[in-house]
């Protein structure tokens, strides 16, 4: 029987260049992926960037760049980190990619149809700086 193992890094928020914390979490994830492969698991190891939100918009404005152009540049530095660290990831996904958008829409529609997503009121804390 084939044993599957799915693991991801956090999806990194490209409001700035990668730092030691990004390297650390990537290396730890890579260690788990490699270990599971040694145990003959079919491993799917993903990493990537989450390119939506106010922080990205603010940083792009500070740099006098279009948010998409800003994300293209910064995400490329995150992608290059996978090569610099010799990570064994199977894919690098950006939330602005068409394939990601298509998958999210499909999953969202399934959740709506099943009643798992519904309109209601919610109170919570949100801060761009947190």
Task: Report residues per predicted region.
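N-terminal, positively charged nucleic-acid-binding surface of large information/translation enzymes
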Residues: 1-130
